[in-house]
Amino acid sequence: MESMLDRPEQELVLVVDDTPDNLLLMRELLEEQYRVRTAGSGPAGLRAAVEEPRPDLILLDVNMPGMDGYEVCRRLKADPLTRDIPLMFLTARADRDDEQQGLALGAVDYLGKPVSPPIVLARVRTHLQLKANADFLRDKSEYLELEVRRRTRQLQQLQDAVIEALATLGDLRDNPRSRHLPRIERYVRLLAEHLAAQRAFADELTPEAVDLLSKSALLHDIGKVAVPDRVLLNPGQLDAADTALLQGHTRAGRDALASAERRLGQPSGFLRFARQIAYSHHERWDGRGFPEGLAGERIPLAARIVALADRYDELTSRHAYRPPLAHAEAVLLIQAGAGSEFDPRLVEAFVAVADAFAEVARRYADSAEALDVEMQRLEQAVAESIELTAPPA
């Protein structure tokens, strides 16, 4: 769309009239102050109206053979390129009904013939000024809209970067080379988008909610920053005290995110999802999970979705203490958990998108380097545990 800054200083007026003398008269009257373009028929006027640069104002004779001024006006107002150009009718008709018809079609003024030069110049100047004001407001509005979009994109990019940084803090405790987080984000999106197409979930899983849920899933283990390495990385059986420490990561994550939500001072869909997920993604459908032993739909939907995605990732990822399961085996195990570990409806959705899960697992598989790092960290954790449990000399 043409900006006011791109326009020449002198406005362009298009005059459409089938009488050459009238065209000459209007040109002589206007050309000292404006650029003037003329057309001798309705069709010629339509062509002239879309030529670049487009006119700022159109003076249009009503009584023309073939295509009269009213029809020209209708077509101009129907064309997105010309509908906002102000149009003034010129006519020898003095009938009030004719004037009402012209104004109803979108004309801004109605001038009688023979024209009065001072009145024509005054009306032309008035309508050009009105158009300039309208264009200024439109351009300013467009600029502000573009600026808001730009700022929104910047804030979104900043938010995404902060989310990734925070999520990585938690993931670093397990394995800094793992691609667990990119996989989880994509698994959650696949499940949520499939569920969103079902009536039972459509209200809760709007497109915006799916985006927020996918991103907030990255923070599911943020509370692990509060768990000692010797507990977090211990491949063996934990005692009761260490089990409590490990399970405490759900409360630590929830409390940190709840604190952020309070400091924000207003509701945040992202933080709400993140808090629910961090606290409840280890709950089970049958109520045998932790930290609260919630069952069924008392477990937030976001947490139920992440629980299934996280379980699939655990089963199909390479670990230092065990090889990954094949995709088909993982699918069977998750199906077996329907009604006990997982919401049965989510398991149905998972089966429907299982091939896409397999593709994500393949594309974002951990490298051999990630496995080496995990092995080193496990060895360090075991050594630390031995030191802590060794009897004093």
Swiss-Prot record:
A divalent metal cation 2 binds at residues 221, 249, 281-282. It catalyses: 3',3'-c-di-GMP + 2 H2O = 2 GMP + 2 H(+). Keywords: c-di-GMP, Hydrolase, Metal-binding, Phosphoprotein. It comes from the Bacteria. The modification 4-aspartylphosphate is found at residue 61. The keyword rRNA-binding does not apply. InterPro entries: CheY-like_superfamily, Cyclic_di-GMP/3'3'-cGAMP_PDE, HD/PDEase_dom, HD_GYP_dom, Sig_transdc_resp-reg_receiver. One of its GO terms (biological process) is phosphorelay signal transduction system. Disruption phenotype: Disruption mutant has increased levels of cyclic di-GMP. Mutation leads to reduction in both swarming and twitching motility, to an increase in pyoverdine production, and a reduction in virulence. It produces a biofilm with little heterogeneity. Homodimer. Contains an unselective bimetallic binding site, with a high-affinity site (H-site) and a low-affinity site (L-site). Metal binding to the H-site triggers the binding to the L-site. This bimetallic center may play a structural more than a catalytic role. This is Cyclic di-GMP phosphodiesterase PA4781.
